[in-house]
Amino acid sequence: MKTLKVNIVTPDGPVYDADIEMVSVRAESGELGILPGHIPTVAPLKIAAVRLKKDGQTELVAVSGGIVEVRPDHVTILAQTAETSEQIDKERALAAKRRAEERLQKQTPDVDIIRAELALKRAINRLDVAR
């Protein structure tokens, strides 16, 4: 079966590099499924899991925004942050989720609501991928 070369890179360096049969990402415009031979595309990404399929198995990588560049035989994801399920510290992600929920419940003038909502989305994404 044909494959795509997939690279997921953050400012801290590479996170993932493999040949994959299919990649699914959540772009700002909606879900994007990428197979070998896909037309060239560039799209901004939402906070979500990237699904990588190979040999009937699916791997997940938690991505916190960024962009995806698609070429017929190569996909590059430039992410603000990215972690494979093995790299995620579940306790730390759970603590981040609790902190964000507390901030949102307080709703005091010094709490940045948008920032707290983004922190909650990132924590939930990390916990979903870690499972």
UniProtKB/Swiss-Prot annotation:
It comes from the Bacteria. Keywords: ATP synthesis, Cell membrane, CF(1), Hydrogen ion transport, Ion transport, Membrane, Transport. NCBIfam families: ATP_synt_epsi, PRK00571.1-3, PRK13446.1. GO terms for molecular function: ATP binding; proton-transporting ATP synthase activity, rotational mechanism. HAMAP family: ATP_synth_epsil_bac. Its main location: membrane. The keyword Coiled coil does not apply. This is ATP synthase epsilon chain. It is a peripheral membrane protein. Pfam families: ATP-synt_DE, ATP-synt_DE_N. The gene is atpC. It comes from Bacillus licheniformis (strain ATCC 14580 / DSM 13 / JCM 2505 / CCUG 7422 / NBRC 12200 / NCIMB 9375 / NCTC 10341 / NRRL NRS-1264 / Gibson 46). F-type ATPases have 2 components, CF(1) - the catalytic core - and CF(0) - the membrane proton channel. CF(1) has five subunits: alpha(3), beta(3), gamma(1), delta(1), epsilon(1). CF(0) has three main subunits: a, b and c. Belongs to the ATPase epsilon chain family. GO terms for cellular component: plasma membrane; proton-transporting ATP synthase complex. Produces ATP from ADP in the presence of a proton gradient across the membrane. It is found in: Cell membrane.
